[in-house]
């Protein structure tokens, strides 16, 4: 999936995974009781922050990575009919897989 958003510095654009709609035992979860997912796919990565010497700090994630991010990290954005999450590199907790 290609998007027309370019993150700045150490920001990362993530497409959130779908919220779970059914429990393991088969019960359906109503929309108002669904937990917000804390994982998704990286769609775009900024160039990284600069250190004290002005050099770029490399990013740990790349486009296509499946990531786990902080529960309250990031900003939800609605752009061209799609929902995205913009998170800082420090809010990424792990790369899945």
Swiss-Prot record:
Keyword set includes Cytoplasm: yes
Compartments reported by the entry: Cytoplasm
Coiled coil: none
Entry keyword Chaperone: yes
Cross-referenced Pfam families: Cpn10 (PF00166)
GO molecular function: ATP binding; metal ion binding; protein folding chaperone; protein-folding chaperone binding; unfolded protein binding
Main localization, broad class: cytoplasm
GO biological process, one term: chaperone cofactor-dependent protein refolding
Keyword annotations: Chaperone, Cytoplasm
UniProt cross-references to InterPro entries, sorted A to Z: Chaperonin_GroES, Chaperonin_GroES_sf, Chaprnonin_Cpn10_CS, GroES-like_sf
UniProt GO cellular component terms: cytoplasm
Family in the record: Belongs to the GroES chaperonin family.
PANTHER family: 10 KDA HEAT SHOCK PROTEIN (PTHR10772), CO-CHAPERONIN GROES (PTHR10772:SF58)
Biological role stated in the UniProt entry: Together with the chaperonin GroEL, plays an essential role in assisting protein folding. The GroEL-GroES system forms a nano-cage that allows encapsulation of the non-native substrate proteins and provides a physical environment optimized to promote and accelerate protein folding. GroES binds to the apical surface of the GroEL ring, thereby capping the opening of the GroEL channel.
Complexes and interactors: Heptamer of 7 subunits arranged in a ring. Interacts with the chaperonin GroEL.
Name the UniProt record assigns to this protein: Co-chaperonin GroES
């Amino acid at each position: 999936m290609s998007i027309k958003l370019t993150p700045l510095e150490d920001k990362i654009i993530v497409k959130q995974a779908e919220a779970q709609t059914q429990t393991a035992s088969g019960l359906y979860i109503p929309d108002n009781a669904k937990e917000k997912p804390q994982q998704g796919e990286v769609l775009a990565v900024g160039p990284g922050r600069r250190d004290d010497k002005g050099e770029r700090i490399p990013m740990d994630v790349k486009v296509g990575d499946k990531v786990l991010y902080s529960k309250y990290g990031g900003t939800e954005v609605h752009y061209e009919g799609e929902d995205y999450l913009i998170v800082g590199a420090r809010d990424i907790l792990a790369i899945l897989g």
